[in-house]
């Protein structure tokens, strides 16, 4: 370990911070107890992204018990759902000759094309079985505009249309978000980075997420998040 990294980790522990520039929590630092200014964001833990779903994330079901344990530590919990229309612009089936995981150009830029998934009102779009969040206060549904995708819980892919989550959190004095759910390299990462752009402290709880990892997208997502100041932690870094 370099002298610079040792000093960064030492400073983070001494200041009671979880990490700096994407480094994990120092082993000597005590777990942090979230206060009333913190919120747990549970992103898209839905049947469509779980084993047997239409767009399954490998081991996606394994985040559920971790998130359930974390929930006990938070006064503020927000849940998101992908909520697509039939024939959504992000579906490969909408574009003649296109296959899932190819790309196309839409009005707001390059769009990854997905299998049809999380269609409004279907069981595929339901929250995953076993997810227990009885104190969750808000559900954000995203991706329901037919011509625009929405990975982030804050802002749709056009980078203009807001979901209202920013105002909801700030009106309640919340300044820190802990992001969990599916998938690390898409909806989780975009949510965490938008949180930073909007002035929140943002943590991604790594073992409470799983990735799709298309052609190195997971590694890129972690680098992009670190560059934005998103902090990467484990569930054990949070006191129950």
Where would I find each of the regions flagged by the language model?
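Short catalytic/ligand-binding loop motif for oxyanion handling, primarily in non-cytosolic enzymes
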Residues: 85-89, 148-149, 187-188
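N-terminal secretory signal peptides
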Residues: 1-4
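Glycine-rich anion-binding loop/nest that anchors nucleotide
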Residues: 174-190, 204-210
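Histidine/lysine/aspartate-rich catalytic loop segments that bind and position anionic ligands
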Residues: 134-163, 167-168
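N-terminal export signals
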Residues: 7-27
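Histidine-anchored nucleotide/phosphate-binding helix
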Residues: 189-197
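Short, well-ordered alpha-helical scaffold segments within catalytic/effector domains
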Residues: 64, 162-166, 189
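Active-site acidic carboxylates
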Residues: 16, 30-143, 171, 175, ...
